Design a protein with these regions (language model features):
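Gly/Ser/Thr-rich phosphate-binding loop
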Residues: 221-224, 247-251, 261-327, 331, ...
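Conserved AMP-binding/adenylation subdomain of ANL enzymes
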Residues: 173-200, 209-248
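ATP-dependent adenylate-forming carboxylate-activation enzymes
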Residues: 2, 60-63, 78-97, 108-111, ...
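ATP phosphate-binding P-loop of adenylate-forming
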Residues: 38, 157-175, 186-193, 502
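Conserved AMP-binding
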Residues: 60-63, 84, 195, 205-209, ...
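Conserved pre-ATP/AMP-binding loop-to-beta segment of ANL
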Residues: 146-164, 171, 195-201, 207
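AMP-binding/adenylate-forming domain of the ANL superfamily
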Residues: 1-161, 184, 285, 289, ...
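AMP-dependent adenylate-forming
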Residues: 4-6, 104-152, 182, 300-303, ...
Length: 529
């Protein structure tokens, strides 16, 4: 099995040249065409001045052609830097100044904003130029090259991508992952995610989110066919994409998995080809997972866990049984093949006993090379244990009796109210167990009197029988029955949806503002009445 993603695609192009590699609403691309286009695009990058190690920014909406362009970036030896095309102007300006790209690939309607944000002039390749390059193998720009440069040799040590995540300082930071980490991640993933050359996969992930590795590139490395869904996350459209394209494998973070299950045809329309669902990013709701397991016999759900700094996913737990009486969250499982996982207490001492919470440390070859231009931050988050660099995740976990890891929440998601330490995820677990609830978030608010209190936002399944106020009362009653009084949120608000970051995670800052506004409106109504 080829280690480098480029080698894998070249191998499939030779063995199955006409097999569909990529498709979307615009058409499809076979493996030979994928290999040919990505080579031509790599040469085009060289023509525009890109050299190995240079950063190539991608600011564009999700589509199959851009997945092919990523392979071209890798062939040129460049660093893929995917950014959210919807990001605020200030954030875009900061990242472009930080990463100093040699070239930018962008949707045409973003070009003016990019030109104003770039610190120094750099070529901007519109997506329409990629379309022309795909349609015309004898591109005149390529003919104009007197002596095309040879493509650089593939190097596992070279940086493959730089993905920007939210930083603890409030500034985004670029996570650097090399090709060896990707190759080892793919090796470990094969043991749990059963994608083969016969699989038909669907991708719903944003291009600027590291899940694209498992969502898009992993299926291509296996020789599978990949359908790339348009940038529209409506439940009915997502469900139809799975049904119409006879999808066997797809991935969706926990909240999106619940969203797709709200499709009008979800219960009635069968999905006979579906085999495996990969979820993660946020904690999957038990009831939502059970609904998917019931879709047809043999479906399995993989609950994967891993920060961007550990190459997408570091642990995985396979769920096959419905377990109708289950009340606890699903484990995040055991480390992948090239990953080491340790739990440590506040003093840095290792924890081995089941049930004892500690911070999760991740080591092995999947760990990042560091943060771009942030040596001090890199040194603070990468610590050496047994001579091996380990990443401090900031996540609190505990061992189960079988050695699996159970996720308990973020260290910074542990709050203190009235002297009591509270893990917000425990409150969410109880809320999500209430019938017709498929998602919840708990936040800390400050009242007008300076009092610290808990508030919960809740998402209900389509067709929930009770109105919002009655359901909120039912949730409060369940919380009061299962949790001590200090863990029961003062306010429970049913919302239509949660604001999302480009990664698909809930935007907790925006949610906090929404809940605060809803609570203020309710208080005003009480005063007026």
């Amino acid at each position: 099995m080829a280690r480098h993603i480029v080698q894998a695609i070249q191998s499939h192009a030779f063995a199955t040249p006409y097999k569909c590699a990529l498709s979307d609403s615009r058409g499809d691309l076979g493996y030979a065409d994928l290999d040919s286009f990505s080579t031509r695009f790599a040469m085009r990058l060289q023509d525009l001045g890109c050299r190995p190690g240079d950063r190539v920014v991608m600011l564009a909406s999700r589509r199959a052609l851009l997945v092919a362009a990523i392979i071209g970036v890798f062939k040129a030896g460049c660093v893929h830097v995917p950014l959210d095309p919807r990001m605020p102007a200030d954030r875009l300006r900061y990242i472009l100044h930080d990463v100093a790209p040699t070239l930018v690939i962008a949707d045409e309607d973003l070009i003016d904003a990019i030109e104003h944000a770039l610190p120094v002039a750099a070529p901007i390749v519109p997506v329409t130029e990629l379309e022309r390059l795909l349609d015309d193998a004898d591109s005149p720009r390529l003919d104009a090259l007197v002596q095309p440069l040879p493509l650089p040799p593939l190097d596992e040590r070279a940086i493959a991508y730089c993905i920007y995540t939210s930083g603890s300082t409030g500034r985004p930071k670029g996570v650097l992952i090399n090709h060896r980490s990707i190759a080892d991640f793919f090796e470990g993933t094969r043991a749990v995610y059963d994608v083969t050359a016969q699989s038909r996969c669907a991708s719903f992930s944003p291009l600027n989110f590291d899940v694209y590795l498992m969502d898009m590139l992993f299926p291509l490395a296996q020789g599978a066919s990949l359908y790339v869904h348009d940038d529209v996350n409506a439940p009915d459209l997502l469900f139809d994409a799975i049904r119409v394209h006879d999808v066997t494998h797809f991935s969706a973070w926990g909240m999106m998995l619940g969203l797709i299950a709200q499709a009008e045809e979800f219960e009635a329309a069968p999905l006979p080809h579906l085999k495996t669902i990969l979820t993660g990013t946020d904690v999957p709701d038990v009831k939502t997972v059970q609904r998917w397991l019931r879709k047809n016999a043999g479906v399995q759900v993989i609950n994967a866990y891993g920060p961007t700094e550990a190459t997408c996913a570091a642990t995985a737990h396979v769920i096959r049984e419905i377990e109708p009486e289950r009340r606890t969250l699903y484990p995040i499982g055991k480390p992948l093949e090239h990953v080491r996982a340790l739990l440590v207490d506040e003093g840095g001492n290792r924890i081995t006993a089941p049930g004892v919470p500690g911070e999760l440390m991740i080591g092995g070859t999947q760990v990042m090379q560091g943060y771009w231009n942030l040596p001090e931050e890199t040194a603070a988050r990468l610590v050496r244990l047994d001579g091996v660099p380990f990443y401090r995740t900031g996540d609190v976990c505990a061992y189960l009796a079988d050695g699996s890891l159970y996720y308990m929440g973020r260290k910074d998601n542990e709050v203190k109210i009235g002297g009591y330490r509270i893990h917000l995820s425990e409150i969410q677990r109880v809320i999500n167990s209430v019938p017709h609830v498929y998602g919840s978030e708990v936040v800390l608010l400050e009242s007008r009197y300076g009092e610290t209190l808990l508030a919960a936002g809740v998402l209900l399944e389509r067709g929930a029988p009770l109105d919002a106020d009655c359901k909120a009362d039912e949730i409060r009653q369940r919380l009061a029955a299962e949790l001590p009084a200090y863990m029961v949120p003062r306010h429970v608000k049913v919302l239509d949806q949660f604001p999302q970051l480009s990664s698909g995670k809930t935007d907790r800052k925006a949610l906090l503002s929404i809940l605060q506004q809803r609570i203020n409106e309710s208080n005003q109504e009480e005063v007026n009445s």
